C-alpha cells in the first residue's frame, strides 16, 4: 500500500531498527502519529539526548554518560577480575543479577572469520594494554555460546595465557546459540559460579 511520504519515511526509519520488520514498523509509525505533540517531542528529545550524551568508557568500553563509567570508578569492586562481554547489554544483564562484583571489558563485537571480522576489528587491543598496567589475575570470558563466541574466547585464551593470567569461561548453563542478555538470573548466577578454565 502506498502511504503519504512522511509516513513512508517514518516506516522506513523504524524498519532499520534490529528485529523490526515492515509490519511492526508500520504499527509503530501509526502509533507515533497518533501520539500527542508533547509526547512526540519528548520521545524525539530523549532519542537525540541519548545519541548526543552517551559515549564509550575509555577504560572498559561500556556505554556511559560519564568517562570513566561508574563501574570503572567504583573502587569497591574486585579489581582482580575482568568479565569480557560482547556489548553493553551484556553488562546490564550481569549487573542485574548482583552476583558479579568485578570489572568489565566490552568487545563491541566478536571475532567472526566467516564475516571477515578479525581480532583487530573488535575492542581487544585496549584489553591487552589495560591488563599490562593492572592487578588482574583472572579474565572471565562471557561471550555468547555461538561459533563466533567460541572463536573469540579461544583467541583471548591463547593471547592471555602466556602472560600468566587465568582465563575462564562461563559454565554451560547457557544453551548453545543463546544470548547472555536473554538468559534468566539463575542461569547467569550458575554460569558465573561454575565457570571453567580455558
Swiss-Prot record:
Q: Where are the zinc fingers (C4-type)?
A: 57-72
Q: Does the keyword Chaperone apply?
A: no
SMART domains attached here?
Answer: TOPRIM (SM00493)
Q: Does the keyword Cell inner membrane apply?
A: no
Cite the InterPro entries for this sequence. Answer: DNA_Rcmb_RecR (IPR000093), Rcmb_RecR (IPR023627), Rcmb_RecR_Znf (IPR015967), TOPRIM_dom (IPR006171), TOPRIM_RecR (IPR034137)
Residue span(s) of domain Toprim? 80-175
Q: Name one GO biological process term.
A: DNA recombination
- The name this protein carries in UniProt is Recombination protein RecR
Gene source species: Streptococcus gordonii (strain Challis / ATCC 35105 / BCRC 15272 / CH1 / DL1 / V288)
